[in-house]
Amino acid sequence: MKYLLPSAAAGLLLLAAQPTMAANTGGYATTDGGDVSGAVKKTARSLQEIVDIIEAAKKDSSGKVVKGGAFPLVITYNGNEDALIKAAEANICGQWSKDPRGVEIKEFTKGITILGTNGSSANFGIWVVNSSNVVVRNMRFGYMPGGAKDGDAIRIDNSPNVWIDHNEIFAKNFECAGTPDNDTTFESAVDIKKASTNVTVSYNFIHGVKKVGLSGSSNTDTGRNLTYHHNIYSDVNSRLPLQRGGQVHAYNNLYDGIKSSGFNVRQKGIALIESNWFENALNPVTARNDDSNFGTWELRNNNITSPSDFAKYKITWGKPSTPHINADDWKSTGKFPAVSYSYSPVSAQCVKDKLANYAGVGKNQAVLTAANCK
């Protein structure tokens, strides 16, 4: 199914669903980003202007570099790169070899928020490195160049306490012959790696992406706490996420059109997969390509309750030649520990019926509650 997400003007129902405190991310992250007392607020029209604003915020009024940043920062991005996105769409197989374009938030801990205006768009990524207290909201990322050079839409490296909320990330789920492994047409939507932890990924609309996201860059990069909630994934291939160790809590997400595999829980990680909606999915929950250190999962209150539901929701399973475990009996294999935050999941049916009104850009950061499910 192709999802058409309404804009903020599409209905009054969005007005009654504003979030409370920004730090209530519904997940492990507990950050307001730069939206705190003493913040400096700037507007940027381009990638370069965002870069310049961030670099200036690393120095005090005397020009001295301040470790972690001189002040909290809120950047409103109102640029439009639809022309670049359209050109990339017309030349899909020409994108992977280009140089990646991106804003690097590096060694900034004072707090930073990048907020896109409605109608803005970006053909560049945001890469968070050795930073913390970062929020990215209402940004529309399309057809990132530089797939062969790690041109992710969002990359989080060595950075705790990050919130990725109400964005749209899209590409083309397509293999271009001649690229390495025929799979570097585009890189990831959201990669979280290298000791990053306490990250919340919420209310994003991610579609047409082949490799959605990593939790960990290698079998030694393990041990993080991540929450994915109220995201829509449509026409994607795999890595939802590819989890190397640690804890992943995924609730109230909609998965439609998984072409290869969904959750891939490796390196003795554990995932709580709760109150989600799955349909048209191949291997939605699995552990594979990991020798013997398979992870475990707890399945709770999803639309699928037993293998008897697979045909109804078009769930299928493949058996690779390498060692693997599929959730094809739809039974939990582990018990997830108590989470450190409060949250109120709605039913999986409500996710199916209502989430498109809330996920993605142009929604004024509206949230889905039980009151909106009626």
Curated annotation (Swiss-Prot):
Query: One of this protein's GO BP terms?
Result: pectin catabolic process
Q: Where is the signal peptide?
A: 1-22
Q: Where are the catalytic residues?
A: R239
> What GO molecular functions are on record for this protein?
metal ion binding; pectate lyase activity
**List of residues binding Ca(2+):** D150, D152, E187, D191
Q: What is its EC number?
A: 4.2.2.2
Report the record's disulfide bonds. Answer: C93-C176, C350-C373
Reaction(s) catalysed (UniProt annotation)? Eliminative cleavage of (1->4)-alpha-D-galacturonan to give oligosaccharides with 4-deoxy-alpha-D-galact-4-enuronosyl groups at their non-reducing ends
The cofactor required is: Ca(2+)
List the keywords (alphabetical): Calcium, Disulfide bond, Lyase, Metal-binding, Secreted, Signal
Question: What cellular-component terms does GO give this entry?
Answer: extracellular region
Annotated cofactor note: Binds 1 Ca(2+) ion per subunit.
Q: What is its main location?
A: secreted
Name where it's found.
Secreted
> Its pathway?
Glycan metabolism; pectin degradation; 2-dehydro-3-deoxy-D-gluconate from pectin: step 2/5
The answer to whether the entry has keyword Signal is: yes
> Record's superkingdom?
Bacteria
Job of this protein: Involved in maceration and soft-rotting of plant tissue.
Q: Which family does it belong to?
A: Belongs to the polysaccharide lyase 1 family. PLADES subfamily.
Name the UniProt record assigns to this protein: Pectate lyase 1
User: Which organism does this sequence originate in?
Assistant: Pectobacterium atrosepticum (strain SCRI 1043 / ATCC BAA-672)
Name the gene behind this protein. pel1
